[in-house]
Design a protein with these regions (language model features):
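Single conserved hydrophobic/aromatic residue that forms the stacking wall/gate
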Residues: 1-7, 12
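Long, hydrophobic alpha-helical segments
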Residues: 13-29
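Transmembrane helix boundary and interhelical loop/hinge segments in multi-pass membrane proteins
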Residues: 24-43
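Selective transmembrane-helix segments that form parts of the transport pathway or gating/packing helices
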Residues: 49-76
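Membrane-interfacial helix-loop-helix connectors in multipass membrane proteins
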Residues: 73-95, 143-159
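Junction motif at the cytosolic side of a transmembrane helix
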Residues: 77, 166-183
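A structural motif at transmembrane helix-loop-helix junctions in multipass membrane proteins
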Residues: 95-129, 181-183
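Transmembrane alpha-helical segments of integral membrane proteins
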Residues: 105-109, 135-148
Length: 183
């Protein structure tokens, strides 16, 4: 692979993460603000907070997973898959899905906390951006390792780290959100 191709791949890969990041923040800033106060009152009295948070988390996983899949398909379409093996494409796609799942679980938890605290998009950004940086850094390292041809066994720990972050954010929201739900 020529050096120019690697540089353009890095630039496009970084742009793909920016698209995913903005899509995630825009997706989580809308739903709660659009809820009517009567709908919120109904939800508070009929739905357990854990169930509501799990539903939001699943919604964001599907939404960001779809955006990630489209972004990854565009990445392959515009860059071509000539230098990828079939196995590398699957490994890279697994990284994209793990990243979108970690982002979705983080943003669902942050959005729920920010909404109950009376904050809007700015609070989501302030709370979420510092926490999302490790996700992007690990994902970027994982993608770079795959592009350089490093064996999957030597870089699979990044996927485990993303899965751990996703589970940790979900568990944190599951445990803490009920205390904010009924005030």
């Amino acid at each position: 692979i020529s050096e120019g191709l690697v540089g353009s791949e890095m630039c496009i890969r970084d742009r793909a993460w920016v698209v995913l990041l903005f899509a995630g923040f825009n997706a989580v800033s809308k739903p709660w603000a659009d809820d009517d106060s009567a709908v919120r009152t109904f939800l508070v009295h009929t739905v357990k907070p854990q169930h509501w948070l799990i539903a939001r988390n699943l919604y964001y996983v599907v939404l960001l997973g779809s955006v990630s899949t489209v972004t990854f398909a565009a990445f392959l379409l515009f860059l071509g898959a000539d230098h990828f093996t079939e196995w590398t494409v699957l490994q890279y796609y697994a990284g994209v899905i793990f990243t979108s799942t970690a982002m979705a679980s983080l943003l669902a938890t942050v959005q729920a906390i920010a909404a109950r605290a009376g904050g809007g998009f700015s609070m989501i950004s302030v709370l979420g951006l510092p926490l999302i940086i490790p996700i992007i850094l690990v994902s970027n390292r994982y993608g770079s390792d795959l592009m350089r041809g490093i064996a999957f066994g030597d870089t699979a720990h990044n996927l485990l780290f993303l899965a751990t972050l996703s589970a940790g954010f979900s568990a944190l929201g599951y445990l803490l959100f009920p205390y904010l739900w009924r005030d």
